[in-house]
Amino acid sequence: SKPEVKAHIELESKVIVDLEKQIYALESLKLNTVANSSAMPLQQANLDLQADIHANMASELVTIQNLAINLQATGSEQNIDANIEGLIEANLASQQHSITNLVISADIEDKNLPGGKSKLDVTSNLIANLADETLQVNDLAIKFADLTMNGRILAEKILSDDLAYNGNIQVKPFNLRKLAEDLKIELPEMADNSTLELVQLSSEISGSKQSLNTKDLQLTLDQSQLTGQFGINNFEKPAYTFNLMLDQIDADRYLPPAKEEVEDKTAKEVSTPASSAAGGSSELPLETLRDINAKGSLKIGKLKVSGINSENIVITIDAKDGLIKLSPLAAELYQGKYQGNVNLDARGDNLKLAVDENLQGVQAGPLLKDLTGNDRIAGTANANVKLNGSGKDIDAIKQSLNGNGAFSFTDGALKGINIAEAIRQAKAVLSGQKAAETNEPVQTDFSSLKGTFTANEGIVNNQDLELMSPLLRVTGAGDIDLPREVIDYAVRVSIVGSAEGQGGKTLEDLKGITIPVKITGSFDNPRPKVDLASVLKEQATGEIKAKAEEKLKEKLGDELGGLLGKKLGGDSKSSTSDETTEEPATDEQTSDEADSADEPSEEDLLKEKLKSLF
């Protein structure tokens, strides 16, 4: 059955009728209607209307003057008290109608509004041409709570499904955070609670029932200015187009605050590899990525995000049906440049990722300091990397990474590991001495550091690491396990510098010797281990041999010592003679050999000398 509606209507007016001139009027019209229904959102409505209505049917003109409408509606959760005023003129012949000085004001009571109530004010001048199917909304002004908007709109084909419109809007400065609080709208948690306190907007607009386009967009958000063009097509399944420019923004202020880390070294050391191997990250939003339909570019003058500062950023996106291309990407950061291409494929069960990125002349220390809070490596960095992987979550993608790359750093330092100091400590322990205390920073300075790498299933392998410094020459090879965040690396360190180099004074006696160093541990806690024992053993063996020969020389005499040295060291002449191809002897050679046969050999002389000792 249809819901029941009860209504009471009262009508009072002075009626004027001139049939000859076809003039009709309702003066001092008063209409009161009271309606009740449990089926209506507002169960009770009381409408009062006052107006003077004049109609000239000869000229087909109708005028409604002194229009005043009051509507009072009450419901279980809402109450509305609204007033409407204006002048209505209708030309029935041309089908052009207008409402001049339209004023709508409403007091709304709702538990979801600030203080349980708010006020809405609307003013405008309307012109409608039903023959042309056009509607002009001029001098539009809307005020709700602390939000004020002005504008102008021209709509075409208003009686068909091909509605189109254009115009402009201006939103005066307002405090979005306060407005949301007043309307009891919960905003996402942000690192800076002073954000969203200034918002201002102006734009040219156009569109249809299923589209909205902005041109000459100017949006102020706190200290940031966004300009350009933005469009949405198909509101049910939106497709976005844009060409935007943002002067500057500190995005970290709008992101959730960083969680405080509980410092528990034991738990950290145990959980870092294990948690990475277990892969506890949440699944990637593949369905959301598939729904992205966007094409455009965003240029940013200055950007701070995740602590990283960059300038002149270019982000270009082309995304549709699960294929997302971010190309080209570009930025200037830390005195260098970044260029890259990123491709995402979310059409399958796993997200496929492919990156091709390049860094040139970037100061690695300040970059890492801002990004992680720890500048593990400093210097001017150049790098290129091509990687691809797939998975349902970040950990799975790490475990599937494949590709290659190259890197180089100049005039920098490896921080958290002082190779020279590690060698000094090992040397002191093996010598039974205590290493001298030092105030040197825990870092290894270098003039250049370079290498290439390959990635296979998340394991990054490098075979040609080369580090050069005034004191050290380092070569290395090994693996970095990205999923487990652990290091397994072997380097060979050669002391080449003078006493003026980093720690050079106490290492001068190791100059020219190559020392193996094993580096293991986690990303947060790399542990170098110097195998100096084998090196010192080899060095000591050589020194003992040299001293023994010297003692023999002192006791046996220079002549015998020299002979013994020749025998211990080998006779190069005899070796050469053995390898020389024999030729027929001449008569002169035969005579010389006969004479030399009568002279004692070096071996005979050595034997005679040894006999004389005993």
Task: Give the label of every model feature segment.
Residues 53, 88-90, 276-281:
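Extended, low-complexity, charged intrinsically disordered regions
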Residues 2-12, 21-50, 54, 59-81, ...:
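Small-residue helix/turn framework positions
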Residues 532-614:
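Protein-protein interaction and targeting regions used for scaffolding, dimerization, and localization
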Residues 255, 274-301, 305, 595-604:
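Intrinsic low-complexity, intrinsically disordered segments
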Residues 267-285, 430-442:
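Surface-exposed acidic, glycine/proline-enriched linker/cap segments
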